[in-house]
């Protein structure tokens, strides 16, 4: 009897261990996979692309890019992506979102993008070192940085409505583009995400 009980226990243990075996599958980075309903890499990329596309949409047949280009003799506007404030309770990798915004602007070909303040400090340190240690024909010139014409800023807000095992997650991303010289807001945009999450309940 004890032997049968022992064998049965071993069988149950082996089945349990088999059920807990980790299984990893490589998927495309572009594939949308929502496990928790929280902000993820697809949301970051999708929202960035949508907002940058919004910023180029013309109001009354004209937009800030074309107005700037006309007023500057054909030069493309230069943009710096500034602060993104996370006002939500979710963990949002803001730096990833900033990179997605920069990527979308650069890939558009309509504007130029300059480095952030922290990145510029590192570049300036390297440039200063070059003045002392690099050869004259390879060192970067001083005071030749491109100044930004506009700064992109904004915030992320989120809320959740939960009842039992079901919930609705709502996320709103607001962005503003402001002239560095006049402080005029040349564009205000918003993109929203809404997700329904149904968490099954398991009963014993």
Write out the residue ranges for each language-model feature.
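Sec-dependent bacterial lipoprotein signal peptides
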Residues: 1-20
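Residue-level detector of alpha-helix boundaries and kinks
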Residues: 5, 36-40, 86
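Acidic/proline- and glycine-rich, intrinsically disordered low-complexity segments
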Residues: 136-139
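C-terminal/domain-edge helix-coil "capping" segments
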Residues: 20-74, 141-149, 160-170, 174-204
């Amino acid at each position: 009897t004890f032997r049968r009980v022992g064998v049965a226990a071993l069988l149950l243990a082996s089945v349990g261990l088999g059920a807990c075996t980790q299984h990893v599958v490589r998927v495309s980075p572009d594939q949308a996979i929502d496990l928790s309903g929280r902000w993820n890499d697809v949301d970051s990329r999708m929202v960035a692309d949508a907002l940058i596309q919004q910023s180029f949409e013309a109001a009354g047949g004209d937009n800030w890019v074309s107005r700037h280009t006309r007023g500057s003799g054909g030069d493309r506007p230069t943009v710096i992506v500034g602060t993104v404030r996370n006002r939500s309770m979710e963990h949002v990798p803001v730096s990833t979102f900033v990179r997605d915004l920069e990527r979308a602007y650069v890939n558009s070909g309509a504007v130029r993008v300059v480095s952030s303040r922290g990145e510029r400090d590192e570049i300036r340190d390297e440039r200063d070192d070059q003045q002392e240690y690099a050869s004259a024909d390879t060192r970067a010139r001083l005071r030749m940085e491109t100044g930004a014409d506009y700064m992109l800023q904004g915030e992320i807000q989120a809320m959740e409505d939960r009842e039992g095992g079901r919930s609705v997650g709502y996320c709103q991303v607001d962005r503003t583009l402001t002239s560095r010289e006049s402080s005029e807001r040349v564009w205000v945009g918003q993109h929203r995400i809404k997700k329904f999450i149904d968490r099954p309940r398991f009963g014993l």
